[in-house]
Amino acid sequence: MDGFRVAGALVVGALTAAYLYFGGRFSIALVIIVGYGIYCNEASGGSQDSQEKLDLNKQQKKPCCSDKKIADGGKKTGGCCSDKKNGGGKGGGCCSSKGGKKGGCCSSKGGKKGGCCSSKKNIGDNENTATEVEKAVNYPVTVDFTEVFRKPTKKRSSTPKVFSKNSSSNSRVGKKLSVSKKIGPDGLIKSALTISNETLLSSQIYVLYSSLQGAASKAAKSVYDKLKELDELTNEPKLLNLDDLSDFDDYFINVPVENALYVLVLPSYDIDCPLDYFLQTLEENANDFRVDSFPLRKLVGYTVLGLGDSESWPEKFCYQAKRADHWISRLGGRRIFPLGKVCMKTGGSAKIDEWTSLLAETLKDDEPIIYEYDENADSEEDEEEGNGSDELGDVEDIGGKGSNGKFSGADEIKQMVAKDSPTYKNLTKQGYKVIGSHSGVKICRWTKNELRGKGSCYKKSLFNIASSRCMELTPSLACSSKCVFCWRHGTNPVSKNWRWEVDEPEYILENALKGHYSMIKQMRGVPGVIAERFAKAFEVRHCALSLVGEPILYPHINKFIQLLHQKGITSFLVCNAQHPEALRNIVKVTQLYVSIDAPTKTELKKVDRPLYKDFWERMVECLEILKTVQNHQRTVFRLTLVKGFNMGDVSAYADLVQRGLPGFIEVKGATFSGSSDGNGNPLTMQNIPFYEECVKFVKAFTTELQRRGLHYDLAAEHAHSNCLLIADTKFKINGEWHTHIDFDKFFVLLNSGKDFTYMDYLEKTPEWALFGNGGFAPGNTRVYRKDKKKQNKENQETTTRETPLPPIPA
């Protein structure tokens, strides 16, 4: 090595001299010489270190691994490297040979309990030994032998199936990995491994579906019947309509039974439908930090069957089923069978039966299922796709996903009620005129009655509203509750917030008036219409913003109310006490209603079936807003009584009144609106209270309010509508009730621009409207149905007697 360094030095010196001789710079030559010197020094130091390591290795091996001759003196104790001739010592040293009874840490193959470095041949290569010795010298630690003498565990004979979102994972997971989680730096669970020990055949199967036109309903019934035929099933399957569920959380955060298994049959619509709200709920639950991670891991499993039209809508083929499958998986559900996609045009019933048969065979597999969820899988797949080729993907694969490749509920804005939708057809059939894409107007039966002189609405008795000049309208056909007494029959959309296209308020009002007047014109040829009332009906004076849906959901509700006032139309706004922020910002209205349909949290959920989880807190906040921010408004609590649901606890109702302090409390018995099978409502005629029962409830309610020192009393009634009015005694001026409204004075005050309250536009309540007088408006003739039927029967009998028999033919 020294010879090479000398030769190198001579070469470098010669080159440097030649460089300087031909005019080179001295500084550069100096740098070259210094650099070469440093290089030689480093090379010399490295070789010296290597030699020291080898010497150290030899020194360490001598006492621990000496040969047979040196080990002759270790007969009794068996030295460090005692050999087989001398018995190796009874204790068997740390490097005892195969004769040792207890092989040490480096024993050979003869040791009964081989040590941590046992081997059939030599201990190892010199290089590995040198590295270990160096570590031992620099970092001296105590050697841990606890893992050395542990008995090896037996392997499982069978391994559960693993369903993973990451297809590249083929590892077999043992029984001990029943639950594992990976927690990210933000404290949230990024991945999890869950196991179901329930056998599929012993589970309780729920076939869940959503349907607008009946195809999905028939398909779900077919799946249900097919699964019901399985003799091996322990429990009979159950068939449920998603649209009839009062609370999705009972099934998709909690589970109805411990061994629940879901089979979802879902169509895909290009229009707004109840399925949109279901998907929105799943997405919110998956992204809600207040909801436990993976709540649906309590399920035995789930699978989804999607129905669609791959010919007409290839880009949206089964996209809602894909979304449901995605979000249920994100919530921790175990997919027991692949997502099914059936084209109803080309496949139809045959494909549904084929998918169901394969599902039935899968249910017979009793092996436990492990499902692996990894939140990073989506992002990793997206990165791989982004780094791949620029070829266009299949439209079926990208349908229903956002720009980032993940499912999103806000990727497309739909119309609330499209003209080609079943919802539009159902509403039209029920007598509504749909305005734009989300508003509606309908002529009230009391409007027809007053035009014919057969009576007026209860608002005439209680507040002086002329029914023949009142327009019932809603700027939002969607609602945030699914009340059991609602007459919408499940046809209207539901949502917690606005997610549709928005029509301008000017457009809604203009077309609402046109629609209302067109329906009034249809009354022109009806017998008994009073000409004077018919003429005035074409000048709308009042607008009841109720009808169906939730008007306060409309984003431009304040502008719409102001447009009504500009046309001299009063505003009667009804809300369901579920939107406190919108209620806080509402402008001046003629009268503000808040529906209080139950006095307790449990009963309110049972009656209103609200969509919000914090529905009770929202209602309480709305009551506080009425007492504070909106205390200048003329406020009314509206109670709809349903026997067997909310007529029990008057004390709890009094608590709510004490919290909100409304000016009036309007109590009305529920009206039965036909069959309730369409929207899952449990109401029958047995739940409709008689007028006497309503009076009894109102008297008990008033007594409880007075007992608490709240100044309320029974003021007016409309017995025909099963309706009574409790009013604050401040409206009883000089011993006379003033519950009616002076509408002309209201507009004078409104146009003046000055602040005013509800006490500034009062009008005396007429005698016929007071409690005890029935509330039937004069100038009308009440027609009793029983008498009408009796009279019609008598007229028919008279006609039969007077009509001569036809002549006998020749």
From Swiss-Prot:
Residues that, per the record, bind FMN: 211-215, 304-337
Keywords, in A-Z order: 4Fe-4S, Endoplasmic reticulum, Iron, Iron-sulfur, Isopeptide bond, Lyase, Metal-binding, Nucleotide-binding, S-adenosyl-L-methionine, tRNA processing, Ubl conjugation
Compartments it resides in: Endoplasmic reticulum
EC number assigned by the record: 4.1.3.44
Protein's recorded name: S-adenosyl-L-methionine-dependent tRNA 4-demethylwyosine synthase
GO molecular function: 4 iron, 4 sulfur cluster binding; FMN binding; metal ion binding; S-adenosyl-L-methionine binding; tRNA-4-demethylwyosine synthase activity
Compositional bias of kind Polar residues: 159-172
GO CC annotation: cytoplasm; endoplasmic reticulum
Pathway recorded for this protein: tRNA modification; wybutosine-tRNA(Phe) biosynthesis
Organism ancestry: Eukaryota, Fungi, Dikarya, Ascomycota, Saccharomycotina
Consequence recorded when altering E550A: Loss of function
